[in-house]
UniProtKB/Swiss-Prot annotation:
Gene3D superfamilies: 3.30.465.10, UDP-N-acetylenolpyruvoylglucosamine reductase, C-terminal domain (3.90.78.10), Uridine Diphospho-n-acetylenolpyruvylglucosamine Reductase, domain 2 (3.30.43.10). The keyword NADP applies. Cell wall formation. It comes from the Bacteria. This is UDP-N-acetylenolpyruvoylglucosamine reductase. Residues 198-228 are annotated as: Disordered. It is found in: Cytoplasm. The active site is at residues 167, 216, 298. GO terms for biological process: cell division; cell wall organization; peptidoglycan biosynthetic process; regulation of cell shape.
Length: 308
């Protein structure tokens, strides 16, 4: 076993990751590191052998870890990284702060980040993936982010550094985003709270919120960045082309395309990562055969298949 740097947080070898993903699948990581604080994270990365891969992991809301696990040090931020501070119309949130919590606390202070309320996951993942909903994206409200680079140094990144695109950014490999500062328009707290309640109601009516899912499985075919027309208002939707191909409710093993929303893949019971990824690939092929459109995964898939 490789000698790793001493830490004040928790460092666990051969840590199964299935309980850390919303789909409850996946094999073990070589190591899981949960740093105590920023300095602990910096010191660890500074002294970690350069040939060891690092994979920053949020709350696992948009992730399939393959059944063979990850040959990496997985870094998962916790309580030391979930603070939320509001100053005027700016909000600084730790990467581990849940999107919903950021939206609520911002609204209480009269700052409109309500689009974050129904986005699963944490701010770190939301920034990394340029998450969006209701025609708004993180890129629209982003000011800056602090990241710890692979060598342990701390850097402040601008929107230009991250190069926001539709559902992606250009973040250096091994870099761990630790906080982000956002700026939203001012609004009446009661009106913002009411809007979020309406958003939650609509979400619960249309999405399988009681099932184990990872949010949208595929990107909408005509995905624009937030500098163009938002994909949320495009007519062509991933769920529509999936429906047109007759794949609502399609299954493979314990994996299923939800009957409630056909662009949501669920673990209907006992699914493996191979079931979920295999079903997704089946859907992609059949949609292409039906419509000529190759759907792109929105769920991140990482790791190795299980060895037979």
């Amino acid at each position: 076993m490789t000698d790793l740097p001493a830490v004040r947080g928790r460092l666990t070898p051969n840590r199964d990751l299935s309980d850390l993903t919303w789909l409850r699948v996946g094999g073990p990581a070589d190591y899981l590191f949960q740093p105590a604080d920023l300095e602990d994270l910096q010191e660890f990365l500074r002294n970690l052998p350069a040939d060891m891969d690092v994979f920053p992991m949020g709350v696992g809301s948009n992730l399939i870890v393959r059944d063979g696990g990850l040959r990496s040090v997985v870094i998962r931020l916790g309580r030391g990284f979930n603070g939320i501070e509001v100053d005027g119309d700016t909000v600084t949130a730790g990467a581990a702060a849940l999107d919903a919590h950021v939206a609520r606390k911002s609204a209480e202070a009269g700052v409109d980040l309500t689009f974050l309320r129904t986005i699963p996951g944490s701010i770190g993942g939301a920034v990394r993936m340029n998450a969006g909903c209701y025609g708004s994206y993180v890129a629209d409200v982003f000011m800056s982010a602090q990241v710890v680079l692979r060598d342990g140094s701390l850097a402040t990144l601008s929107a230009e550094d991250l190069q926001f695109k539709y559902r992606q950014t250009e973040l250096a490999p091994g870099a761990v985003l630790v906080s982000a500062t956002l700026r939203g328009p001012k609004g009446d707290p009661d009106a913002l709270a009411a809007r979020m309640e309406d958003q939650l109601r609509k979400r619960d009516e249309t999405q399988p919120t009681k099932e184990r899912s990872a949010g949208s499985t595929f990107r909408n075919p005509a995905g624009f960045s937030s500098t163009g027309k938002a994909d949320d208002v495009m007519d062509l939707k991933a769920w529509k082309v999936i429906d047109n191909a007759g794949l609502r409710g399609a299954t493979l093993g314990g994996a299923q395309m939800s009957e409630k929303h056909s662009n949501f893949m669920i673990n209907a019971g006992g699914a493996t990562a191979a079931d979920l990824e295999g079903l997704g690939e089946n859907v992609r092929k059949k949609v292409y055969a039906d419509s000529g459109i190759w759907l792109e995964w929105e769920i991140m898939r990482v790791g190795d298949p299980k060895r037979s």
